[in-house]
């Protein structure tokens, strides 16, 4: 789809501030409307409004929008579905229906208070109180036994499920009992179809899957369950259920009782759920995601082969009495003004342009920092950005670190999609790393695996200030983020336009 959009966003009086980020929208020449607080705009204060204006250029598929300040994303989120333009279909058999499924977390406590507690205490947050499918907790909680998200299907028909992980701090499995899913899209980009019995989505990722109603008439649980590869991290060890229900005049719509192991046509069948830390299965699943076809009209592959800038980014947690997180041992400090506004108006003192291209010291990253190298465990704190010339082909190597403990980090880049060329176990070695330049997936969020590395490439052809951060909200709070400043080009349509007149002020 190509088309312009204007969206009016207002912060209601009982919220101090908010704003909206259009996750996955590449915002071509519209960086002012990208949305992250203190990066491209100031928050929209209570009672104020701001009109987002941007063009969807050669994009389609399942994306989503969410708040991008504090932990308001816990409940302030929703789907953004971009359909193919008229006359252009799907590269697969059209489904009879489609359904959006948003995976989320439910908190009994005020999430803004939780964020303040994390900052003030220096510790980690507790796990959420429940997981939700489209806002519903499902049958395993006393308060919600009848609040179950349900999809009605007709035997023999095909359905498209658009699945979004909007959770704050948890990666999740998704599966449907006795059904195989065919993956056809990730992060709004078509993929080579492949069959799977489960998905694993990091926060910020989306998957489109086809599912055929080819089982016996009855009910089947749709399940979301936590994936937690990090050791000793607190999280809710619980599953939430929805129902896939086959329509039939002989099956009555009964109230669902407690989870039962009795398998009848009236009791939903349960899926087989992977172990909570089954990293091998998750890696095998992720490795199947490929671009549709290298030279196909639906998704041409244009991987930059000549690299202008290579960046080696270590990512992970730090500890020195309090938890911190960093990129190249720099913990990001959010400024008090919008970085984009500071850049455009040449405001001094709000950021520096010396973000390191690589770690100060090289060592065995995965197995932890040597105790005698304090710089590797005590991060610097600052608001530093990395400068990219317009049009540069950029390669970024993400390296997970084990200073506190290895963990999976879903890294999201604003303003661009990127080619995920490969991942590998241990410390990155350019002489042995196997990179896929033929049909790599095109994504906006990459789950850097536990104790592994990941390599991406993109072309920096969109001027502006672009945030890159871990989509586990607690890690962003601790500072696992940075920003790229992409400079103006010399040609037509290569310069950042002036700010809108109604841009919120700090």
Q: Which residue stretches match the model-derived regions?
A:
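Short, structured patches in soluble enzyme cores that scaffold and shape functional sites
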Residues: 56, 69, 82-84, 103-105, ...
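Acidic-aromatic/histidine active-site loop/patch
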Residues: 95-167, 265-279, 309, 316-318, ...
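Extracytoplasmic/periplasmic copper-protein system
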Residues: 76-103, 235-276, 435, 478-506
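Conserved small-residue hotspots that stabilize compact domain segments
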Residues: 177-187, 191-194, 198-252, 256-291
């Amino acid at each position: 789809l190509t088309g312009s959009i204007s969206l009016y966003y207002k912060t209601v009086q009982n919220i101090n501030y908010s704003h909206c980020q259009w996750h996955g929208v590449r915002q071509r020449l519209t960086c002012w409307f990208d949305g992250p607080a203190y990066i491209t705009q100031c928050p929209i204060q209570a009672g104020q409004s701001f009109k987002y204006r941007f063009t969807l250029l050669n994009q389609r598929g399942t994306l989503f929008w969410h708040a991008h300040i504090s932990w308001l994303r816990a409940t302030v989120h929703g789907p953004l579905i971009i359909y193919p333009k008229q006359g252009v279909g799907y590269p697969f058999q059209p489904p009879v229906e489609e359904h959006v499924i948003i995976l989320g977390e439910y908190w009994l406590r005020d999430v803004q208070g939780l964020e303040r507690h994390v900052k003030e205490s220096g510790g980690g947050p507790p796990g959420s109180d429940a997981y939700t499918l489209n806002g519903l907790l499902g049958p395993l909680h006393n308060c919600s036994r009848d609040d179950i998200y349900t999809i009605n299907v007709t035997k023999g028909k095909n359905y498209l499920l658009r699945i979004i992980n909007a959770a704050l701090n948890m990666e999740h499995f998704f599966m449907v009992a006795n059904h195989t899913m065919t993956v056809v899209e990730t992060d709004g980009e078509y993929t080579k179809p492949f069959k799977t019995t489960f998905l694993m989505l990091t926060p910020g990722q989306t998957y489109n899957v086809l599912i055929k109603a080819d089982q016996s008439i009855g009910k089947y649980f749709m399940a979301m369950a936590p994936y937690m590869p990090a050791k000793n991290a607190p999280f809710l060890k619980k599953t939430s259920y929805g129902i896939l229900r086959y329509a039939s005049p002989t099956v009555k719509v009964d109230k669902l009782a407690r989870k039962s192991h009795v398998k009848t046509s009236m009791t939903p069948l349960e899926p087989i759920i992977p172990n909570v830390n089954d990293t091998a299965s998750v890696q095998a699943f992720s490795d199947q995601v490929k671009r549709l076809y290298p030279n196909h009209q639906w998704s041409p592959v244009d991987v930059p082969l000549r690299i202008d800038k290579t960046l080696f980014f270590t990512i992970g947690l730090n500890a020195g009495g309090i938890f911190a997180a960093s990129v190249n041992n720099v913990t990001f400090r959010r400024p008090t003004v919008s970085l984009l506004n500071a850049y455009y108006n040449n405001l001094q003192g709000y950021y520096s342009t010396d973000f390191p291209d690589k770690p100060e010291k090289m060592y065995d990253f995965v197995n932890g920092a040597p105790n005698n190298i304090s710089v590797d465990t005590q991060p610097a704190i600052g608001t530093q950005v990395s400068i990219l010339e317009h049009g540069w082909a950029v390669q970024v190597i993400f390296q997970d670190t084990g200073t506190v403990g290895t963990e999976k980090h879903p890294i999201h880049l604003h303003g661009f999609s990127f080619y995920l060329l490969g991942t590998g176990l241990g410390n990155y070695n350019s002489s042995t790393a196997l990179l896929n330049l033929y049909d790599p997936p095109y994504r906006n969020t990459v789950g850097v695996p536990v104790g592994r590395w990941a390599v991406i490439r993109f072309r920096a052809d969109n001027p502006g200030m672009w945030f890159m951060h871990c989509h586990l909200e607690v890690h962003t709070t601790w500072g696992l983020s940075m920003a790229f400043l992409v400079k103006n080009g010399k040609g037509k349509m290569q310069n950042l336009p002036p700010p809108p007149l109604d841009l919120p002020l700090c």
